[in-house]
Amino acid sequence: MSFLELKSVEVYYDDVPAIRGVSLKIEKGELVSIIGANGAGKTTTLNTISGLLQPRPGEIWFEDKRIDTLPAHRVADRGIVQIPEGRRLFPLMTVLENLKIGAYSPCAKGDYRRTLQDVFNLLPLLKERRNQIAHTLSGGEQQMLAIGRGLMGKPRLLMLDEPSLGLAPILVRAVFETVKKIKSQGTTVLLVEQNVRHSLELAHRGYVMENGRITLEGTGLEVLNNSHVKSAYLGI
């Protein structure tokens, strides 16, 4: 079985279907990208993996164990970390305090100092700004803090939801360079992103989601070069 596997997952808001029959796989060490328009079901998929939503029907397996019946905090304890869209920082806390909150799971608490140093090595700006209040950071700096906070949880699977949203092009490049470094360290990554070209160029494999369904899958370059993807998402 794959590192993470979704089997025919369906999620409803009341009686309205949000995702329908979603099946996808991620192997250990892969970076997998899900692309799609607003409302396609991408964030719902991440929230369901995280245990914030319950599939009905469908199954989610992580490291050969079924997790779709677990509450969200138990899913997080297994090493699944989600960095939400919009960063969701604690704005009146310092950078360091936000990072500490990321290390709440038992395994992360036990290795806090080493993990903090690893995060500072990856994102040296956070070390420089560690005593600065989070809401005074720029948008790009706040996104780096959100990524750093996620890494403090020592993720076995790191899920990023629209990390480049609302950022200037130069900051978008910086965010994707950071994701590339995380990938190179062997962390398994599930990336939801509307910046189609950047995300698929970086991905081992990609999925296209439309109207709550997976409509296309392949290697990152296969999906990027697909004629429908070029027309619908790249304007080519």
Model-found features: residue ranges?
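ABC-type ATPase nucleotide-binding domains, specifically the catalytic core motifs of the NBD
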Residues: D14, V32, L70, V95-R114, ...
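The feature captures the beta-strand-to-loop junction immediately N-terminal to the Walker
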Residues: I35-A37
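Conserved catalytic motifs of ABC-family nucleotide-binding domains
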Residues: K154
